[in-house]
Every structure is written in C-alpha cells, then in structure tokens.
C-alpha cells in the first residue's frame, strides 16, 4: 500500500488538524517532552501508599498539540486531598509566550489553551492493575525503536485513586534516528471519581556509535483517545472510546503506525487503544483512517465505536456517517456468517461444503424431521403412560416422578450471543430420538422401568405357596364362623331336655337339616381351596419381572446377549456363561446357588408347571393372569426362556460345571417361561426347549423314573403335531421315531463332546446337547450295523444283512439334510448356515453298504458304492487317523478285485492289501480304551482283509484248477493280519470264531499236514452242530469251514461217503439264511462236481 492509498483510508476527523501542522510545532512538542525531566518528583514511585492517598504537588494535564487558534478539550483527573471535589469542574488556561527558534532549533510554540475538565463516570467494578505498555515504532528506512511504558494503579479503601510514578523509560535507537520517549497514562475509577491523564517521563538515550549531532527533521505527533460517556434509551450508561488513529507520512518514507493498548477495568476488562503516530516532513494532511475491530470481553458489549466527529461549524460530516454505517453492516454480516457456519457444522459436519441457502434449507428439513419424530414419540409416550396408568393405578405417582426425573430437554444456544434473556426450553426439543443418518449414535427411548420388573428368589414364591397351603390345612374360617354363635342360648349354656346327635339340636335330626348345617363348612373349605389356588396363581405374576420394550434395561440385555452370541461363535464358553448370567441379572432374575436355592427353585418350578398343565387350573391361570400377559410380558418371558435354555445346554455339554439338579432347575425354568411366552417362540424353539429339558432330566435321573423324560418328550412331539409351519429338521425328527425313543430312554449315551467320536461322525456344536445326542445316535446306528454284520442275532430275521441295511438306511435318513439345531444362536464355524450334513457318517455308511453287497456277491453295486467311498471326507484326511486310511486302502483293494483283470489286477490288489494291513496294525496297537464301535470296525476290516486274501489265493489256481501253496509275500501278509485278529480276539468274543476259520485257511495256504487240518475242522464243526431252531454265534464261519474242507482236503479224509454231502447241504442252508450268495455259489459248484463224480462212479 502506497502513501496515497493509506491517506485515503485515514479518519476524516483528523484532516482538519493536519493542515496547520508545521515542523516547529513538532520540535516544540519534542522539547516539551524532553524538558519533563525537570520535574522528577512527579514520577517517584509511590508503592507504599496503601491506606491513604498521597496528593500530587500540582495537577499536570495532558498536553495535546493542536493547530494555532484551535482550542482542544481534554479530560484529565485532578487529585485533591478530599473526595468531595470529584464532581467539580476546574477550568485552567495556560498562556505561553511565542519565540522564534533558530534554524536548527524548534520554533516558539504559539499560545495553546488547555482546558481540563473533571466529570463523573459510572463503572461496575474497579480493580487495581499494573500494565506495562510497549510500543515498537519501525520506520522503513531506519532500524527499529522500542518504546516502553508502565502504569501502576492502586485503589485504597477510601474510594480514592492514586497514580503511581511510572518507571524510567529507556529507548534504544540507531545512530541515524533521534531517540525519543512517549508515555501515556489513563486510569478509570469507580463512580464518583475522576480520570487523570499524565504524560511525562525522563528520557535516557543510549547511542550505539557515531557521536555526531543528528538533525531531527521528522515530526512526531502524540494524540490520546477521548472517553465518551453515553446514555442509552433504557437509562444505562455505556462507556465507549473514540479511537482516533493517526498515521505517519513523509515525502519519501512509507507510513508506520502503532497503537498502544492499555487495558482498564469496567465490569470485567475494557480494552482501549492509544494510537501513536510518527511522521516527518512539513505540513502533512491527515486523511481518514479505518477504525479498529471491536472487542467483546467478559460478556459485556463494550467496544470501540466510531462516533461522528463535529467539525468547526458543528455539522457532522456525511462521510463519517457512511463509514459508521458500513462498520455496523459489516459487523452484522460477520455475525450472521458465523452463525451460518456454526449451523453448517451442526447439521452437515465440519468437512461439508455448501452455500448459505443450502445450509439453511438442510437445517429447515432437519428441524421438520425432528418435529415429526418428536410428535410421534410424544404420541407413543402418551399411549404408554395411559396403558401404565390403567395396569398399575397404584404406582402412577411414582412413575410420574420417575418420568419427570428422567426427561430432560436441552434448548439450543440462542442465535444472538449478546442476548440477556433467560434460557428457555425449545419447543422442538425432544427427550428421545430414533436413529437418523445425521446422528452418530442412536438414542433410544428412555422409559422408566415398571415396578413389577424387580424379581425375587424362588424360595420367596415357595414360601407364599407354603403359607397358602398352611392356611388351607388349618382352615381358620370355620372357627371364626363358629365363634360368632350366640353365647346366651340355652343349648350352649346348659343341658337340654333331650339328647342330641353329633352336637346338633333336636330339630336338625333329619338328613336335609343336617346337610344344611354341614353345607356352610363345605363352602368354607371350597372357598379356602379356591383362594389358595388363586393365591398361587397370583404368585406367578406378583413378582414376575417384565422388561419394557425399548427401555434402557432392554438395551443392556440385548448388548450382553449379542456379546454372548459372539463369544459362543468364537468358542469362548466361559465368557458366554458370564454374559448370559449378566443377561439374567439385567432381567432381574436370579440363578440358584446353594442347595436350598436349588431345592426351592425345583419345587417352585414343579408347582408352576402343575398350575398350568391341568385344564381347570390352566383356565384359572389364564383368567387371573390374562391382563398381565401382554406383549411386553410375553417378550420378556421369551428372552428369559432362551437364556435359561442356553445355560442348560452349556451345563449339559460340560462347558459349565454345575450339578445335574441345577441343570434340571434351569431347564424347567426355560419350559415354564416358554409356556408363558406362548406365540413368541416358534415351534422349533419350543421343541428344542422341551427336548433339552428331557435330556437334562434323563441325565440327572439315569435309567430311573424314565416316565418323566418320556412325558417331556411326548409334550415336544405334541408340539410338532400342532405346528402348521415347515417340518422339523432331521436333527429333531429322529428322536420321535420308535428306535430314537428307545435309544433315548434305554441306551447309555453322553452329550459331552468326545474326540474319539470325530472318527465316525462330523464335528457338532459342542454347546448343543441335541446335536451331541444326534451324534451319539448316529454312532449307535453304526455300531449296531457293524455288529450285526459281524455276528447274527437270531433266525427270525429275514437275513443277517437285512438288519444291517435297515440300520444304514435309517442312518442315511438322519444325516441326509439336517438343519442347525441352535436356531436362537448362530452356528459355529464348522456348521453351515442352511443345512448341516454329516459327510463322515455317510461315508462310513457307504463303506458298510459296499461290504454287505460284496459279501452278497453284487459286484455292480459294489463298484458304484466304492467309487463314492474312495472320496474320503476332508475331515478324515485332516484327522490323520490310521483306521480310516486302512478302510480306504481296503476299498481300493476290493475295487480292484471285482474288476475282470487277471494279472495286473491281482498284483495291484495285493499292494493295496499290504497298505491296509500296515495301517490296521498301527490302529490295533494304538487302541486301548476305544469304544465298541471302534473295536467292531477294526474287527470287521481285519476279517474282510483276510477274506479278500483268501479269495485272491483261491482265484490263482494251479494247472489242475486247484490252488497250490501261496507265495511267501502273501503268506507273510496273511500272518500279520492274523496276528492283529488274535489281538482283537482278546476283547471280542466273535473274533474267536473267525480266528479258527482263518487259522485253518493259513494251514491250507502253507500246505501243512492235511490230517491235522482235518482234525481241527472236524473238531470245530462237531462242536457247533446246532438244532434247527437256533442260530448261534459263528454259524457263518462254520459254513465257510465246511466249504474249505470239501474243496481243499483229500477225498479219503472225508469218510464215510455220504458225510461230505450232508456237510455241504448244511452249509448251503446256512449261507442261504445269512444271504452270503458268493459263498453259496461256491457251495453249489462243489455239490455239482460231487454229484457228477458220484454219477460217473455209479455208471
């Protein structure tokens, strides 16, 4: 900015003063300032004057340089010894003589009239304050100057004011600039005091270098601000300052202006400015300057205001009015812009960019949205209040107090920060807000909890029921009614003329009269019984906790419930137990801890269940508690039932160490709450609750009192028949089948997760007893199928393999498409969200089915089934157990054996047999405490492997068609499998019969003595000769032994001649009965060959 532009922005009120300024005026002012050192007593420090005000020797007014013949009025404070002179006005005129200065000396000062006035001023508060002032004046062509001033003010108790002596001023200047000192002091006093301004100080000049006289040719002007005391229309007074900044201008040097700011106190802090203007040159016209910004300190609107300046003629200039108007408009626009920016930050955020109209439009839309939400919530709040008043009229006052305590309305800040109106509630403020995209956190409706939401222990309920039954047994009503009989009657006072029967008077001897006398007692007993039942029913709802919807209690419950779901999903069962217990505590429900609590809870749950189940009592329960069973009550019962149900599941599966009776109490609580929830639970969830309760009762009682779990199971089955929704999943449907019910009630099972079960079934939810029970059922079906395949039970069966296929078919139906059984909670990571299949169990079922068809001789079915069995599930590959690997190698060997290839097929089949034999040997050596299923599968695999080796040996015959001695590799493999069979025979009785058969076979394969082999076969066959009506263990092995003897032993050993035919006929009947078609075909071939040889010999 150049000098011309700066001059245009100067205050027009100073233009009339600048035309008369000369260099001599400025020099004389400098001399006046420099000569103030002659009065050192004025600036002595007066720090010790605390109680009394010291009087100055003389009053020194503020000197202001003005043009000639132009008087200027300044305000100063005159200190006197008394405070009564505070409102007097003293006019002093000082006359000085004019002199002509030399060329290098300041010219004489013209006569200057200084008028000092003292006027009262009203302030709010006065504080003692010492504030240093520092001014830095930096011309463009010269180094910087530092001007420092310090004013010390003190007020005593006598409401007088004292101006202390400022410190010595020190100025550091450069060699090219004349040192100077500028000092200004201003003091504001309370009402009734005066204002005094002193400007004097000795000056000390420190010269850096060049001790050469310097000609000061730039004038320096010092002008103070004036204080104006204006009166507002309402009668209050506002202190304002007229800021008159001046500028410095020279012909060749830019202007440098600096304002000295001195804080004073008026009700808080008032910031006024003291402009200092320095310049050089001859007469410099002072133009209009822009006023400084307003300062708002301490909440009071006290600022620097631009007031119109009166010219010599007393007329306000037009430019000054326009400047004042522009300043006011600029202030208004700045305030509006600030509020619009604040509104944008509230509605759109700090990063949003939008023009003013868009911000206002968004704010209007948001206000309308809040009004709609407020109206909706008020309507809902009114509805809930009316319902609460209708249901709980006795607690209306308490609820209203809680509502008043909880509802808090917050009004937005006023748009005008300077408004002094008290804060009022906004009509658009709401006490609750739903979630909206403009809010970061969803605020839920805050409602008071109902008085019935406080739960009690079950022992308190049981105590009330016991008291009711005690009243029924004692029945005090008849005694109370009997005490009201008249005491002065002759029948009571003395003996009557005749005898009485049953203490009845003579006129009541008839049956009708007797019944009329007994009827009141019967009515009393009936009324007492009904009252006791009604009291027990009332106990159901007296302290039954109910959680209001969308209340803080409901929010806390769902927060912990979701946390429990997440912990169950991650497998953190200990944390899930704590979260579920917290859920119950939020719902004001208490779990039993001690033995007394468990017994009381069990008794109360049984009483509660008995009150609902019978038809008359159930009708009474619905009649009494109908008005209590609202939507909130049913929802609370549903939430609590699911939590109790999950805790019972965790206790049953071993994830929570509690006693079995504790689990029974929790499961019965879930059943009762499920009955209270009614339609809030789906049919699948209700069936799960009842089945879990039956499992808990069955696990606690064992095989005793099986009628109780059977009753709960029948209730669950009745729910499945009543539901019209989609059918139950297979994981629940199997338990209602006859075989599933028999397994549940009579078999031994455990719902705790076991690692050994993962070999035969897929992994299930460790925290779901129904899933674990389903796993046990699948393992039981596999066990029954395996043992049925190993040993037949009776001849009444249609065939040995028929029962096996039935078990396997039921197993496939149970594992075909099973939905997840944990509907209220998310499935585990190893479960699918749509359906849960058991690929491991189905693989074992396909292997057993292929074994049955291979024994039956159905090679086509064997090839199709083994093609599927060769794709072993990934879970078994990951498990890396030797038994599934042995079974897989056996399946590949059987697959190669049924192929029509001869040479290469036999070699490949034997190699697979070697691998299967090695894995089986490892599995047998590792098994110590395995289940019957594990041992049965090992025995079956070993038997099938030995049977396959025997078949391969018989297939590779010699030149005459009969098989010769087996090679050493085949014989060593057969011996290793036989040793594994001997080891399994120690714990399994059926292995002894198979062991004798395969020991005979190995003698034939090795070419041992046929006489000793015949003796062994004859001893075994004679020991197992049975009657026609029985089928004992080892019958199939005896038939195979007969076939070996008739096929491989010499004919002379089988004497007499008819004995061989009888043995073959018996073996044929046995093989037909067990369904072994492959061995039956061999038996028929031998019979045909035997009959052909007999015919030729006879001819």
UniProtKB/Swiss-Prot annotation:
Residues 320-370 form the bHLH domain. Residues 71-100 have a biased composition (Low complexity). It comes from the Eukaryota. Residues 1-461, 535-1099 are cytoplasmic. The keyword Transmembrane helix applies. GO terms for cellular component: endoplasmic reticulum membrane; ER to Golgi transport vesicle membrane; Golgi membrane; nucleus. Keywords: Activator, Cholesterol metabolism, Cytoplasmic vesicle, DNA-binding, Endoplasmic reticulum, Golgi apparatus, Lipid metabolism, Membrane, Nucleus, Steroid metabolism, Sterol metabolism, Transcription, Transcription regulation, Transmembrane, Transmembrane helix. The keyword Signal does not apply. The chain crosses the membrane at residues 462-482, 514-534. This is Sterol regulatory element-binding protein 2. The lineage of its organism: Eukaryota, Metazoa, Chordata, Craniata, Vertebrata.
